[in-house]
A protein has these predicted regions:
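Alpha/beta-hydrolase superfamily serine-hydrolase fold, recognizing
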Residues: 3-91, 100-101, 127-446
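A detector of tandem-repeat and repeat-rich interaction/domain scaffolds
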Residues: 108-128
Length: 446
């Protein structure tokens, strides 16, 4: 791929709204089904893009940030402005029925039977299971009161109806850069169901966002760091303390998340180390495409100290802001940690800045990265730092995928890829070191 030089960064970053889709559609590394889907998106959204150009609006950067407005008011203003130009048409595209998706990307693969803890669901195409509750117990009515600051946090609990108690459990933190989205959003409800069908109880913690509330949970309070991180730790503690009531197996609790949720998974582990409660995550941490450093200094990116993925994959789904880029206000330290710079490099806010000493004694950890993600190499660098700290760490790279492309992004295009990641998470959660060594011979079908 053509390398993006520092001198062209600003011009490139202010490119048209479909720059990411065009990069994906042309990138030979990316799964062809995803490429075809993005080509169709381009065709559908080019009229919207043209309207934006006529109004001289190229993206979030060009919408006036009135310094007299508060942070939240500014965000609301930007969302309203963008909605005028149909940006959120993506939400409608995301609801396409299977026949429409197949008309874009071609026939979906026939799926294997989806294995449960005991028995199988009927054979079908994985795509069908993105929408159904068949074989699942879905409880979106529960909440708990945080022992840290008394905030009331909602949780989504999904598990197979045939799963035998006590349940191997994943405490999941959703992505969205710690600033947006919700565990109750349709993309996460689909992902939780996919995970649950691998023999797991999934408990999604709907922590406070630092940016704005999601339509799926519009009353969720908004607050910068450490509010959301506190909710995540409190969620883990609530699950552990109420294990009997929830039928959770205390010896098989994994914390996991993708993107911003990957950040929160690692920061929760750091918080647990500080509190002396790492035993609560008995199966460890599974962090996917973790967004762990916010805004890097431009010299760091162009020096290759963080690898080459920031340059190689720049603009594919993510445009991580650097230096004084206005995007930093929207998606980086300023939004998550507010204007108070004291937390901009706090490892519990941004684990990428953790030292080897900070990481010592953390529980076992999987760092999963995507080949075509700008964050790929900093995730790999973090994995190597974990090894230096003598943490039992593992790393996997999912080829042909962009940021989050094996979980919530493009799950309708590549359900088989997402299913493979779900299976890996299940194995990591259900068979931690204790269970591997204590398995009975009859349980190991070798």
């Amino acid at each position: 791929m053509k390398e993006i030089q520092p001198s062209t960064y600003i011009k490139y970053n202010n490119n048209n709204m479909l720059s990411s889709e065009r990069l994906i559609a042309k990138d030979p590394r990316i799964d062809p089904r995803v490429r075809r889907f993005n080509q169709k998106l381009i065709e559908l959204l080019e009229p919207v893009e043209q309207k934006m150009k006529e109004q001289n609006i190229h993206g979030l950067q060009d919408i006036h940030l009135d310094p007299s407005l508060t942070r939240i008011e500014t965000i609301k203003m930007m969302r309203k402005e963008l909605a005028t130009y149909g940006i959120f048409i993506y939400n409608e595209i995301n609801k396409l029925p299977r026949d429409k998706v197949e008309s874009i990307i071609g026939p979906l693969k026939e799926g294997e039977p989806i294995r449960l803890h005991s028995g199988y669901l009927p054979e079908t195409r994985e795509y069908d299971y993105l929408y159904t509750n068949e074989g699942l117990d879905v409880d979106n009515s529960q909440s708990f009161t945080s022992t840290i600051d008394n905030n009331i946090v909602k949780v989504s609990i999904i598990k197979p109806t045939t799963l035998k108690a006590p349940y191997p459990t994943v405490v999941y933190y959703h992505g969205g850069g710690m600033t947006q989205s919700s565990a109750f959003g349709p993309q996460y409800q689909r992902w939780f169901k996919t995970l649950a069908r691998q023999g797991l109880c999934i408990i999604g913690v709907d922590f406070r966002n630092a940016g704005f509330a999601d339509p799926a949970n519009p009353t969720n309070p908004i607050a910068p760091f450490p509010a959301g991180a506190n909710d995540c730790y409190a969620g883990l503690k609530w699950v552990y303390d109420n294990a009997e009531k929830l039928n959770v197996d205390r010896n098989r609790i994994l914390i996991a998340g993708e993107s911003g949720g990957g950040n929160l998974s690692i920061s929760t582990a750091l918080k647990a180390k500080e509190e002396g409660t790492m035993h609560m995550m008995s199966s460890g941490v599974y962090a996917m495409c973790p967004y762990i450093a916010g805004t890097w200094n431009g010299n760091e990116i162009w020096s290759d100290r963080l690898g080459i993925s920031h340059k190689e994959n720049f603009g594919i789904v993510l445009k991580i802001p650097i230096d004084n880029d206005p995007n930093a206000y929207v998606y980086g330290q300023k939004m998550y940690c507010s204007e108070d710079k004291t937390n901009w490099f706090n490892p519990k806010a941004w684990p990428g800045y953790a030292t080897v000493e900070d990481l010592k004694d953390l529980p076992r950890m999987m760092i999963s990265v995507n080949e075509c993600d700008p964050l790929r190499d900093e995730g790999i660098c973090f994995y190597r730092k974990l090894l230096k700290a003598n943490v039992k760490a593992y790393c996997r790279t999912v080829l042909g995928t962009c940021h989050g492309g094996d979980s919530i992004v493009y799950d309708k295009c590549v359900p088989d890829v997402c299913l493979q990641t779900a299976r890996d998470i299940s194995q990591f959660a259900r068979f931690n070191d204790h269970h591997l060594y204590d398995m009975k011979v009859n349980d190991a079908k070798l």
